[in-house]
Amino acid sequence: MAWISLILSLLALSSGAISQAVVTQESALTTSPGETVTLTCRSSTGAVTTSNYANWVQEKPDHLFTGLIGGTNNRAPGVPARFSGSLIGDKAALTITGTQTEDEAMYFCALWYSNHWVFGGGTKLTVLG
């Protein structure tokens, strides 16, 4: 049930007002079915590390939230294998390999800072076709 807690935190703390840290994501990306796309998540405090426990949450147009990745690279139960999390350089990354039209959604990154989560503004992924 950790995913429920994370999603509730997203709703409650999305402004990030309790932290000096700022989490930045691409505002929008476009891809096509079958392509590989990588979304990134940068921290204003320096390199993202495994200690930030990067989490990725998907929001579908009907406002259904799904936790995809926890702890940088751990796929949540039931999440398709085409979704993977990693660190690339100084950023956290979500890679979708073989994108499907159903992957069109908003994707939010959350980073852990000692005692609270800070969320990025989200990336709107458009899948053409």
Swiss-Prot record:
Residues 20-125 form the Ig-like domain. One of its GO terms (biological process) is adaptive immune response. Keywords: Adaptive immunity, Immunity, Immunoglobulin, Pyrrolidone carboxylic acid, Signal. GO terms for cellular component: immunoglobulin complex. CDD domains: IgV_L_lambda (cd04984). InterPro entries: Ig-like_dom (IPR007110), Ig-like_dom_sf (IPR036179), Ig-like_fold (IPR013783), Ig_sub (IPR003599), Ig_V-set (IPR013106), IgV_Light_Chain (IPR050150). Residues 1-19 form the signal peptide. The modification Pyrrolidone carboxylic acid is found at Q20. PANTHER family: IMMUNOGLOBULIN LIGHT CHAIN (PTHR23267). This is Ig lambda-1 chain V region S43. The lineage of its organism: Eukaryota, Metazoa, Chordata, Craniata, Vertebrata.
